[in-house]
From Swiss-Prot:
Function statement: Ion channel inhibitor.
Stated name of the protein: Toxin ICK-9
Localization of this protein: Secreted
Family label: Belongs to the neurotoxin 25 family. ICK-8 subfamily.
Entry remark concerning the domains of this protein: The presence of a 'disulfide through disulfide knot' structurally defines this protein as a knottin.
Disulphide-bonded residues: 59-74, 67-80, 71-116, 73-87
Keywords: Disulfide bond, Ion channel impairing toxin, Knottin, Secreted, Signal, Toxin
UniProt GO MF annotations: ion channel regulator activity; toxin activity
Signal peptide interval: 1-19
Tissue: Expressed by the venom gland.
UniProt GO cellular component terms: extracellular region
Amino acid sequence: MMKLYSLVIIATLAAAAFAATSEEISAAVSEIISQHQQDLERYAKIVERGEEPKKYIRCSKQLGEKCDLNCECCGAAAYCEDIVYICKEKISDNSILNAFGQAMTAMGNAVSRYYCDAE
């Protein structure tokens, strides 16, 4: 049983190595980092202008709905896409990169939760 388990793990890692190049992985990581950096910049500009920041409610938007910050989108791997500002989850058409990107987004969302208030 242990040999079968090890074989499955090795096969999965080999498939991941062939499916995703390091450039694709670093591009996905850079995209996720820039999304959270944009949240910070938008929030900082509001505070800098002395305006009362809009009250953002954590997990108040579903996938496909309009959003302003990542923390508004429901789902551990959901983020606010920065072109049309809608909640989405898909990072890449490559399933391995998509899974990796969703994991990175989930970690980033855990860090950036303080931008939104709990309801």
